[in-house]
Amino acid sequence: MKIYLVGGAVRDALLEQPAGDRDWVVVGADQAQMEAQGFKPVGKDFPVFLHPRSGEEYALARTERKSGRGYRGFVVDADPSVTLEEDLLRRDFTINAIARDEETGELFDPYNGARDLQARVLRHVGPAFVEDPVRVLRAARFMARLAPLGFTLAADTAALMREMAASGELDSLVPERVWQELRRALSCAQPSAFLRTLHDADALRVILPEVDALYGVPQRAEFHPEVDTGIHQEMVSDMAARLAPGDALVGFAALTHDLGKALTPPEEWPRHVMHEQRGVAPLQALCERLKVPQDFRQLAIIACREHLNVHRLAELRDRTLHELLVRCDAFRRPERIAQLALVCEADKRGRLGSEEAAYPQGEALKRLHAAALAINARDLAAEGLQGPQIGEALTKARIAAIAAARRIGA
């Protein structure tokens, strides 16, 4: 019985990057032996155990044979005779197929993952890559994480991904897994690499058709020197990751704020009048399909509808700005205003030549919201107002507070 550290922990150590959870593989053991040593079985589909003290996951070495469509269609063999090399062969990428002996620290690298780490290449381990559609998503997500370190996708891996997209294999992806990988990608430093990798593989049209439809749609060059809305979307996603590192909530709203531009009739290009309203329906469809959590949905819809209003904040009347705050539910959910400001700043700076531009609208929005938020119903009730009178007086007082804050900030 031999134990090896495998996967991301080994990879990240070699990259000198912070490591997450540690995963272990056990060679030459069966379930009875593991339980005899105090390990607790937890795997439903695979022979996985929790260490009795550390709680870390230990999996028996296994092979997987394709038996059906999708990522669940596999027959697993975890016989004690399965070798470490056979176990590593089933893994997705060479950089994840490196093992380290728990006792000696020696690396076991039969598929040259260390060489690919050195060359900064993301490459599939073997032909079985095409058997699991989730690996297309994982390739894109790893690129979102590793592209800032100089990684590129191996040409043969990119070719396999295109084959998988063309074969219809991606149709078997379950919504929950798509959302999981998208959310993780939006938490990475370069989400554009996720989008670009999938788009180049012709997989984005299957996974996120609402986003894929933005590519090739022109915008006015005086406002968008990058012209292509798809490229703008990539830049906005990266800017959101820069402004709010690791914040997938802001990242998702940034990703989906311009979906309406794909619905602009071509004869109206490059203008996109009312795209902020047109974008709500495809955004809601995307959220329904992927079962997106409510907090993500709500902020994304707010950003989609309101980003142009925030851009022209100085032009809004005090009452109009108050109405915007009400639509954002900003008096019950005050955190939304800072989030909305970040999305709008990412939109404004996610353009060629504007990456370092100032965005005073964001700070102004937060300041005016804070002034309105300082007015509360309890104070008005203490003055003897009751029922509808309180609501009317509260609105009037908050609008007055916005006006006063504007005069001070002018």
Curated annotation (Swiss-Prot):
Cited Gene3D superfamilies: Beta Polymerase, domain 2 (3.30.460.10), cca-adding enzyme, domain 2 (1.10.3090.10)
GO biological process, one term: RNA repair
Keyword GTP-binding: no
Co-factor remark: Magnesium is required for nucleotidyltransferase activity.
Catalytic reactions on record: a tRNA precursor + 2 CTP + ATP = a tRNA with a 3' CCA end + 3 diphosphate; a tRNA with a 3' CCA end + 2 CTP + ATP = a tRNA with a 3' CCACCA end + 3 diphosphate
Recorded superkingdom: Bacteria
Cofactor(s) it depends on: Mg(2+); Ni(2+)
Residues annotated for Mg(2+) binding in this entry: D21, D23
UniProt keyword terms in alphabetical order: ATP-binding, Hydrolase, Magnesium, Metal-binding, Multifunctional enzyme, Nickel, Nucleotide-binding, Nucleotidyltransferase, RNA repair, RNA-binding, Transferase, tRNA processing
CDD domains according to UniProt: NT_ClassII-CCAase
InterPro entries linked: CCA_bact, HD_domain, NT_sf, PolA_pol_head_dom, PolyA_RNA-bd, tRNA_CCA-adding_enzyme
Molecular function terms from GO: ATP binding; CCA tRNA nucleotidyltransferase activity; cyclic-nucleotide phosphodiesterase activity; magnesium ion binding; phosphatase activity; tRNA binding
PANTHER family: MULTIFUNCTIONAL CCA PROTEIN
Record comment regarding domains: Comprises two domains: an N-terminal domain containing the nucleotidyltransferase activity and a C-terminal HD domain associated with both phosphodiesterase and phosphatase activities.
Sequence similarity: Belongs to the tRNA nucleotidyltransferase/poly(A) polymerase family. Bacterial CCA-adding enzyme type 1 subfamily.
Note: A single active site specifically recognizes both ATP and CTP and is responsible for their addition.
Quaternary assembly: Monomer. Can also form homodimers and oligomers.
Record HAMAP family: CCA_bact_type1
Function: Catalyzes the addition and repair of the essential 3'-terminal CCA sequence in tRNAs without using a nucleic acid template. Adds these three nucleotides in the order of C, C, and A to the tRNA nucleotide-73, using CTP and ATP as substrates and producing inorganic pyrophosphate. tRNA 3'-terminal CCA addition is required both for tRNA processing and repair. Also involved in tRNA surveillance by mediating tandem CCA addition to generate a CCACCA at the 3' terminus of unstable tRNAs. While stable tRNAs receive only 3'-terminal CCA, unstable tRNAs are marked with CCACCA and rapidly degraded.
Protein name stated in the entry: Multifunctional CCA protein
Source lineage: Bacteria, Pseudomonadati, Pseudomonadota, Gammaproteobacteria, Lysobacterales
